[in-house]
């Protein structure tokens, strides 16, 4: 914000003509004697925290008025002070708030926004009669006042005992995943802990999954065919998961107009760094989740209690967060990502809590299906927890029975977010750092902010809304899978993806030319059965072909030689059942191999291999 403060004998104005952004004002002319005239230009930066800029502007005006010993203040919109103006909606809101804050102790006259005005002013002409000030959104003292100190507990679901976290509790924790998550929450950094490049970054390049796109912004990726296949399979998985549970898929825009008050307030509340830009006279932002579009859609729906709980689901391709360059780490933290995002409208808190519990188990199921066990943390405001602790203890008990694990509980003394309760689930990477993935949140603000109502007889009710990402971002899911694959190597097992996600599920390798026709026939039968199989016809040694299959993490490697052709029994190396230095081999017929792979994949999503069957003509992408 830019301001020009004039100690005036008088200020007189008259509004002459409206512009298209003019406010409907009651006062279109006025005069004030012996006053401080404050010319104000609201700037784009002010949109990041309107409350802070109002507070700082009022403090500066009060300080100047008191120094000059004046009790009359004129608030005068004056766009010519800046070339980087904020949106009209934000400017109107800020100017009105400044007037409101000053009115308790001063006589205030505010000129209307968005009008062509004639004015006369007489400046007193003493050394302090003309002052210019740059007002920022900085919150120095307020940050200290508003700092919320949470309490952390370990909940044992077996005896429902809450143990407040302290150094002794931390030193005795045996669950490495839960300990890593707790240390992350408490910002405990361990000396000597690795801070280099995590293994998954090497894997995504080496396996031709994806890589940074140098001609784009940092944190944006190019995806190769194998990586695109994995992402699509993960997307199919989440789609099936939510649709089976009543989710209705929708699609909404990736950018939004910050002149919409609800959009701007929700964006500011979120607090993450955002991609914001100006196009023409509009201030726009790229979404960081699917909330905006889904909330606007719900606002326009005629909702009745019988529709509840109503679940809308979107795979937001893409969502954007402008993370600092130094914070970008492979697939764990990036600027453009694919977020499965479901929002559930609930008629009341009872229904919201039931849906929360259902979605907790849905999130935990994804860890089971991906073979990436989660550590979990519940977060509640103190009031909400005290009112609903028996419900929480019931979940903790069932979690202990199903998974044999404790959980972390964070209690916040007051509500500083739009939610009163949430649960976060995290995979732990090879450096012992959490990768937060699934989440469920109970939102008690957004329905009112966006004007979402349920028509319940003669009443209009603002519902409770759950935010749920059943898996977290697709990129983070893959990050967790690859980090978990690396951890396999520390347990003498080869790194691998689950068979349903592995791009090449089976590779058929002929020992010599005379075995090629038979081997090709086997590969063809596998593909005809819906198995992603290829055929290594390259002119490499047998040893190199087998090593290449290992490098490509092929789950089932089939070698065809004389004995296989004669007996019809294939020699198959099963990767997920092998040790690092000792391959697990089985002799199977083609039919038995098809049955084994089909049983391995079960009812997981299926897609064909998007590469030529013959390895010799498969392109090299990097």
Curated annotation (Swiss-Prot):
The N-terminal domain is an archaea-specific tRNA-editing domain that hydrolyzes incorrectly charged L-seryl-tRNA(Thr). Catalysis of tRNA editing is performed by the charged tRNA itself. GO terms for cellular component: cytoplasm. Gene3D superfamilies: Anticodon-binding domain, Bira Bifunctional Protein, Domain 2, D-tyrosyl-tRNA(Tyr) deacylase. This is Threonine--tRNA ligase. It is found in: Cytoplasm. Keywords: Aminoacyl-tRNA synthetase, ATP-binding, Cytoplasm, Ligase, Metal-binding, Nucleotide-binding, Protein biosynthesis, RNA-binding, tRNA-binding, Zinc. Its EC number is 6.1.1.3. Belongs to the class-II aminoacyl-tRNA synthetase family. It comes from Methanococcus maripaludis (strain C6 / ATCC BAA-1332). The gene is thrS. Binds 1 zinc ion per subunit. Pfam families: HGTP_anticodon (PF03129), tRNA-synt_2b (PF00587), tRNA-Thr_ED (PF08915). InterPro entries: aa-tRNA-synt_IIb, aa-tRNA-synth_II, aa-tRNA-synth_II/BPL/LPL, Anticodon-bd, Anticodon-bd_dom_sf, DTD-like_sf, Thr-tRNA-ligase_IIa, Threonyl-tRNA_syn_edit_dom_arc.
